[in-house]
Design a protein with these regions (language model features):
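Structured, helix-rich domain cores that form ligand/interaction pockets
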Residues: 1-211
Length: 211
């Protein structure tokens, strides 16, 4: 395991008119790609730096240098807009999660509450999306014991932040993610777009609309 954040790559082989074609799927967290952490949130002005970072990491992984235009125009197959909400007033993430878990989502979603050993996450599952609410600091504490217990992947990169954040007590970090999985789901979520590429979707208003 590298001591830095790297994208996950999957090569898909398909056949078109009897000929094989290959498509590289690239999965990554945009803030982790730039900052090794998703406590910091990106703005539209970060796009150029993000594409440059992605270009360099892909070169490191596969030995091929994709152009920045290729990366900017890459089709989006999965999209996870998210938001960190910081509480400094003794508001407890657990209280918020308990309230959310009591809401009636049944008319729209199937609600499933998943408890991990020393913390909680609420998942709202639908046919075309997945919504996750969780206590980010509790999730990091779980990752410190075992990454398998944590909801976030690659949490080991952020473990050093736990001690730093303790200085800001009573800090609580509530994370909210909406996960559109599959290109059809992304298109349904943003029907106003003509194309669903990395560049066209990296917009604040689109992320806010998804949340």
């Amino acid at each position: 395991r590298l001591n830095k954040y790297m994208p996950r790559l999957t090569m898909h082989k398909r056949f078109s008119k009897g000929e094989p074609t290959f498509h590289l799927a690239v999965e990554f967290s945009a803030p982790k790609l730039l900052f090794d952490s998703n406590f910091d949130e990106l703005v539209e002005a970060d796009f150029e730096s993000l594409v440059t970072a992605l270009q360099e990491k892909l070169f490191e992984l596969v030995g091929s240098r994709f152009s920045k235009r290729q990366l900017a125009e890459a089709d989006i197959g999965t999209w996870h807009p998210s938001k960190n909400i910081i509480f400094l007033d003794y508001t407890s993430c657990q209280t918020v999660l308990n309230t959310i878990s009591k809401l009636d989502f049944s008319r729209v979603y199937d609600l499933q509450k998943t408890d991990f050993r020393d913390g909680h996450v609420v998942h709202v599952h639908g046919n075309s999306l997945d919504i996750a609410f969780y206590d980010k600091l509790a999730d990091l504490r779980q990752a410190k014991k075992s990454e398998k217990r944590a909801i976030e992947k690659d949490s080991y990169l952020q473990l050093n932040l736990l001690d730093q954040l303790e200085e800001y007590r009573p800090i609580e970090v509530f994370r909210y993610e909406v996960r559109f999985v599959g290109r059809a789901s992304v298109k349904r979520a943003y029907p106003e777009l003509d194309k669903w590429t990395f560049e066209t979707m990296f917009k604040r208003k689109l992320c806010q609309a998804g949340l």
